[in-house]
A protein has these predicted regions:
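Extracellular/oxidizing-compartment recognition motifs
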Residues: 2-86, 90-476, 483-484, 500-503, ...
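Non-catalytic C-terminal accessory modules of carbohydrate-active enzymes
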Residues: 230-239, 252-285, 310-320, 370, ...
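Active-site acid/base region of carbohydrate-active enzymes
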Residues: 161, 255-262, 424-457, 463, ...
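Alpha-helical support elements that line or immediately flank enzyme active sites
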Residues: 152, 156, 346-365, 404-407, ...
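Active/binding-pocket-proximal capping segment
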Residues: 162, 171-173, 178, 509, ...
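C-terminal capping/lid segments that line or modulate ligand- or cofactor-binding pockets
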Residues: 206, 276-277, 477, 495, ...
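Beta-strand segments within the central parallel beta-sheet cores of soluble alpha/beta enzyme folds
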Residues: 104-109, 155, 205-208, 362, ...
Length: 867
């Protein structure tokens, strides 16, 4: 008998989550040393006691032994769960040999569910909406402890941002919570386990500092954030439940018994920066020994008006620290710190100088030509009031003082510091890299330095722009553009555990949908973006992202949840169509052009906007057709898709020559990517595309849409040699052109106009996984239950190693070449199969073989490598 065991259990894609308001969905991974083994049945038991759950006593719910191989997102189907309750669960799985494996007990805790809040929304009486120098209010409440504490949970929503402290210690490393939403539709509360923060005896104090965030953004910008329908002064709602050893419970609620005071954060704006006057500090303000003389009573205030839901997405945190690689003093007496990497985050400042001195920190990704200042002009134009990416600190003493901003983040590589002494007695600046704290679960490495450089650019741009929402850039806009997210969500799911992050943003999209089915081009939106930029090309993400999440998990409940919203959006597109053609989108944004960013005239795009818009309209119909079949619903969309396809071909593809309107890389790639032609015609079109690229000197000639179309279709047709030649061009336009000009992240425009930290061209990373390593889904089979291994062994890459974390375990593909021999290694997770597809130059009888779960190693002869 082999070794068969359960190795990981998750609930709603988390291990032991706190605070679930949605139905629990269970998942588990298994291992077996028997190649090709699989699960044949499972049983889930849920109990309020861990030992009972593991003993198979599911006094809350027992699924019973259920035949099947399902181990991803199995829904809880027991009686209604109680709010604020910990439940333990175990799963027993049986394999083909009849062996049973029992998991260790795991747990989940419910959130508030439908329980009414006992707490009231409160604010500080000194906060006024007409002020534009808004600082951060501090709120506190001291309370007795009646005995030995068994457990304590804090349920909290502080708008715009909150940081909570108990007896002087912050309760979490989380930052900028809650995540940005359309607050008058939906806000998130977070649940913290604060048991260890409470003292053993005596009184305790809970303190909360509130930032403005996106909720009270008073800065004028191009997207009308100051006029947001939800905008109001910062406010707090929280309940601290304390359970004692004797089983009794206290609830400390936000109410008028709280005290409030201004503090050292005299200004904070997510669009401008943060100002901190250390002379105004309140030492010990969140401790019981503090005398709150002069503090004012909190006031009751109306809430944000939307639904309150427990946050499941990973929080934003500091994930890495970067020390300066260079520091120097300018001719004007300022200091320049180069952190060596463009990123999103903030700094930890060690401030030197006399008491009362002000240190001004300005952030940006570039320096002026003479290196004397940070260059902010190219990205600051949309922020119309206040200073751009500027923090200020006023010292309280003559000694060194350490400070980190609380309620902002910036996009930068360089920091310009004004007000520091001529000589620095010690380290001064440390970069703190911030992003949504998902794990990096995918890995791609190879011996080719160019590909690894591009992969690093994609990584740093990606994490810079995952800040509770998928932003376009971390400095100029911080906006969640739909088109950018639609282009990059595949690589995010391959590189990171980004499911919850993307699911949260999908909910944002649905909350922003208007009754007519339209969605904005940026989301969350203040109302901007419904009348421009929200064509099918950008809004297509409402269709593609649910399918991508379904493809990742195999959970049809995802499709069921978003299906009505997708249908309404399809109806909106149909209302905008004229004779089957739609033409109200942005088009192939940022294809190579001359001039500064945000000056692109859409009429100059080679690929007609009506072509790309209508192709996306067609794809939405096709995907709705597939979703309807998965959900067992009537399918009117297949016939609709054929009508759209006929209209597109009539208008944009020459029936005699097969030439596509625009005669460019994006046009050809668009028609092929959306499979608008018959297979033989599509193959000829791909030959024409490869020829077109060669005639263009292997140069890139596409924008955001074409980046996905061209590279993926070349990969589908086995033309990774063409992709390789495009990616390794060192001149304009191309990735290496950016690198040659000092970029450490992806730029917005091929000519380096505009932002230098945009992630919209990062789908190339997904191409590395899918077409270089060759790990990709096999048809429409979801959750990698069956997948392809189609490594590009004919490329001139000596070594390659790639892994993808599937719901069943780690998929691995890698090779090492030695002369005309290649050793290929594959890892296939338990309960899955992989179909091997090899390039023509590989002499292998295993080509086309189906590999079962386990580790596989092959040694083959290989022809001369391409590329």
């Amino acid at each position: 008998m082999g070794c068969f065991k359960i190795v990981q259990c998750t609930c709603n894609h988390q291990e032991n989550p706190l605070g679930l308001d949605r139905t629990p969905r269970f998942g588990w991974k298994m291992r077996s040393d028997t190649r090709g083994d699989a699960q044949t049945a499972y049983r889930i038991t849920v109990s309020t006691d861990a030992r009972r759950a593991q003993a198979g006593q599911g006094d809350v719910w027992d699924s019973g032994q259920t035949a099947g191989d399902e181990n991803v997102s199995v829904a809880y189907a027991g009686p209604p769960l109680q709010p604020r309750t910990r439940y333990y669960w175990c799963v027993t799985a049986w394999n083909r040999a009849g062996e049973a494996a029992v998991s260790r007990p795991a747990f989940f805790e419910t959130g508030k569910l439908n329980e009414a809040w006992r707490a009231r929304w409160i604010t500080a009486p000194f906060l006024k909406m007409d002020k534009t120098d808004t600082g951060a209010p501090y709120l506190r409440r001291t309370f007795p402890l009646r005995g030995e504490v068994r457990s304590a949970r804090l349920y909290i929503c502080g708008l715009g941002y909150h940081e909570a402290f108990i007896e002087g210690k912050k309760v979490s490393e989380n930052l900028l919570e809650p995540a940005f939403t359309k607050y008058d539709a939906l806000s998130y509360y977070r649940v913290y386990d604060v048991t260890e923060h409470l003292p053993a005896a005596g009184p305790a104090t809970l303190g909360v500092a509130l930032g403005n965030g996106w909720y009270n953004c008073f800065t004028e910008d191009a997207w009308n954030i100051r006029q947001a329908s939800w905008r109001a002064v910062p406010k707090l709602l929280c309940e601290l439940y304390i359970t004692y050893a004797d089983g009794t419970q206290d609830c400390i609620c936000s109410d008028t018994g709280w005290k409030t005071s201004p503090g050292p954060i005299t200004f904070n704006s997510i669009r401008n920066g943060e100002w901190y006057d250390a002379r105004l500090e309140l030492p010990g303000w969140s401790e019981s020994t503090y005398g709150a003389d002069g503090w004012q009573d909190a006031e009751l205030v109306r809430g944000a008006g939307g639904v309150l839901r427990a946050a499941e997405m990973q929080p934003i945190r500091v994930m890495q620290e970067l020390a300066p690689v260079n520091a120097y003093r300018t001719q004007e007496g300022r200091w320049i710190f180069d952190l060596g990497q463009n990123f999103a985050g903030k700094v930890r400042l060690t401030a030197y100088g006399p008491a009362g001195s002000e240190i001004v920190l300005r952030y940006c990704e570039d320096l002026t030509g003479d290196g004397q200042h940070v260059e902010q002009k190219h990205i600051s134009g949309f922020v119309r009031t206040g200073e751009f990416q500027t923090d200020k600190y006023i010292k309280k003493s003559d000694g060194p003082e350490e400070w980190t901003p609380q309620f902002v983040y910036h996009g930068f590589r360089y920091v310009e510091a004004e007000g520091l002494p001529e000589e620095l007695p010690g380290p001064c600046i440390m970069g703190l890299v911030m992003h949504t704290s998902f794990e990096r679960t995918g890995h791609f490495e190879c011996s080719d330095d160019t590909l690894m450089t591009i992969q690093r650019l994609c990584h740093w741009s990606s994490i810079s722009n995952c800040q509770g929402v998928p932003t376009d850039c971390p400095h100029r806009e911080k906006n969640a553009w739909t088109g950018d997210a639609g282009t990059v969500h595949d690589q995010l799911l391959l590189n990171y555990d980004a499911f919850l992050f993307l699911e949260k943003w999908l909910d944002d999209l649905c909350q922003s949908q208007r009754p007519n089915g339209s969605i904005p081009c940026v989301c969350p939106s203040t109302g901007w973006g419904y009348n421009w930029g929200n064509g099918p090309d950008w809004s297509m993400v409402l269709t593609t992202l649910p399918w991508a999440l379904y493809e990742q998990t195999g959970d049809a409940a995802i499709l069921a949840r978003y299906y009505p919203f997708i249908c309404r959006h399809f109806d909106f597109m149909s209302s905008m169509a004229v004779d089957g053609i739609v033409n109200y989108g942005i088009g192939d944004w940022c294809a190579p052009f001359d001039g500064p960013a945000i000056s692109v005239n859409m009429s100059t795009f080679k690929a007609p906007v009506a072509l790309t818009d209508t192709a996306c309209y067609y794809r939405s119909a096709r995907m709705l057709s597939k979703m309807s079949r998965v959900l067992g619903l009537d399918d009117p969309y297949l016939a609709r898709s054929e009508e759209i396809r006929a209209a597109l071909l009539r208008n944009f593809v020459d029936a005699d020559t097969g030439e596509v309107a625009g005669a460019c890389q994006t046009s050809d790639g668009c028609v092929a990517f959306h499979h608008l032609l018959k297979p033989q015609e599509e193959a000829r079109l791909m030959e024409r595309l490869a020829e077109r690229i060669a005639q263009n000197g292997w140069h890139i000639d596409y924008g955001i849409l074409g980046s996905k179309y061209v590279l993926n279709m070349l990969g589908e047709y086995g033309r990774t040699d063409v992709i390789y030649k495009m990616l390794t061009r060192e001149d304009y336009p191309g990735y290496l052109y950016w690198v040659a000009h000092g970029c450490t992240t992806l730029a917005e425009c091929w000519n380096l106009g505009g932002s230098h930290n945009h992630y919209m061209f990062s789908d190339v990373s997904a191409v590395f996984y899918r077409y270089f390593a060759g790990i990709r889904p096999d048809g429409d089979i979801p959750a990698y239950r069956s997948f392809l291994l189609a490594p590009a062994l004919d490329l001139a890459i000596d070594t390659l190693s790639c892994s993808v974390e599937s719901p069943h375990g780690t998929i691995f593909a890698g090779w090492k070449k030695d002369g005309d021999t290649v050793t290929f290694t594959a890892g296939v997770p338990f309960g899955t199969t992989a179909r091997l597809r090899l390039p023509a130059g590989v002499q292998a009888p295993e080509n086309g073989a189906v590999l079962g779960g386990g580790r596989h190693e092959f040694c083959w002869k290989i022809a001369q490598s391409a590329g």
